[in-house]
């Protein structure tokens, strides 16, 4: 199953400015992030949890998490 990460890419621009900044936040390399965004490797539960619960503005709600990580193509 492939996911549409358009909303996640916009979220990254707003909150991290660059893919590299987001990769550093997740603790992965930019190549690994690219693989995730191109549906070659899935995001891990740990990575999704980190985004959901570690944002400076507070925890993300389930609707937002769904739109970022689980929107189907």
PLM features per residue range, with description:
Residues 46-64:
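DNA major-groove recognition helix of helix-turn-helix/homeodomain DNA-binding modules
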Residues 2, 35, 62-73:
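Short, charged recognition helix plus adjacent turn
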Residues 28-43:
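Recognition helix of helix-turn-helix/homeodomain-like DNA-binding domains
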Residues 1-17, 21, 25:
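A short, Lys/Arg-rich alpha-helix, primarily the initiator
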Residues 19, 30, 45-48:
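Helix-turn-helix DNA-binding elements, focusing on the entry/boundary residues of the two helices
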Residues 7-8, 33, 47-50:
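A general alpha-helix detector
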Residues 13, 38-40, 49, 53:
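Residue-level detection of the helix-turn-helix DNA-binding "recognition helix"
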């Amino acid at each position: 199953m492939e996911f549409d990460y358009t909303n996640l890419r916009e979220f990254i621009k707003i909150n991290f400015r660059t893919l590299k900044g987001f990769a550093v936040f997740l603790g992965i390399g930019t190549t690994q992030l690219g693989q995730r965004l191109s549906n070659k490797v899935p995001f891990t539960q740990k990575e999704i949890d980190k985004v959901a619960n570690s944002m400076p503005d507070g925890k993300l709600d389930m609707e937002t998490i769904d739109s970022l990580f689980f929107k189907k193509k």
